[in-house]
């Protein structure tokens, strides 16, 4: 695969991992290693060096070639997200920030207005801004215009496992974007990650589907292979769909050709 470029960084893996929901830190670390991911997202509250059982920064920092992308999960307003981003950059040293603002705990849908306001500020402060957004082509374009390095439309609701229910809108975003489009949230299976790559996404972010699997490390490896397969298939050139059968062999008579 060609390298994924985000800001001034390049990554050979196009699978981004979330680090929540795992049964233990060791299970999460095993999954990250098995995935080959070079970019993982971590909630601010998991930067806790004083309590080793809650701290992910230390263990993740030991993985060579891994870049941390703090996120603002828990923020309900642009102001809270900007504050979380500042603290995260100070603690991690990472220029990346995944902007997540979902004030309603019942559906966890991203707030488009607060997200836009936070991204304007953070992009001006030279963060590598990667916002989690509804699958809204107009919002995606506005975020590109203010300097976001990518947009991350949801495939479906966080943790729902409902797959690519927004695929039609995601395809519109891809068509109109000149920055990477990364599907985030709702993916349940490697086949759905493959489909996202085939439709034109530059990467996918997966958390729950790996974290709650019976064998998270094995599932992480399966997602990694699916992402690579989808990317390669897209670049190889997928055949066009047809409304009717198209013969693969000549239909002319041949049985009586020698008589």
Curated annotation (Swiss-Prot):
It is found in: Cytoplasm. Pathway: Cofactor biosynthesis; thiamine diphosphate biosynthesis. It catalyses: [ThiS sulfur-carrier protein]-C-terminal-Gly-aminoethanethioate + 2-iminoacetate + 1-deoxy-D-xylulose 5-phosphate = [ThiS sulfur-carrier protein]-C-terminal Gly-Gly + 2-[(2R,5Z)-2-carboxy-4-methylthiazol-5(2H)-ylidene]ethyl phosphate + 2 H2O + H(+). One of its GO terms (biological process) is thiamine diphosphate biosynthetic process. The keyword Transferase applies. GO terms for molecular function: thiazole synthase activity. The active site is at 98 (schiff-base intermediate with dxp). Keywords: Cytoplasm, Schiff base, Thiamine biosynthesis, Transferase. CDD domains: ThiG. Its EC number is 2.8.1.10. 1-deoxy-D-xylulose 5-phosphate binds at residues 159, 185-186, 207-208. It holds the Pfam family ThiG. Gene3D superfamilies: Aldolase class I. The keyword Cytoplasm applies. Belongs to the ThiG family. Catalyzes the rearrangement of 1-deoxy-D-xylulose 5-phosphate (DXP) to produce the thiazole phosphate moiety of thiamine. Sulfur is provided by the thiocarboxylate moiety of the carrier protein ThiS. In vitro, sulfur can be provided by H(2)S. HAMAP family: ThiG. This is Thiazole synthase. It comes from Chlorobaculum parvum (strain DSM 263 / NCIMB 8327). The gene is thiG.
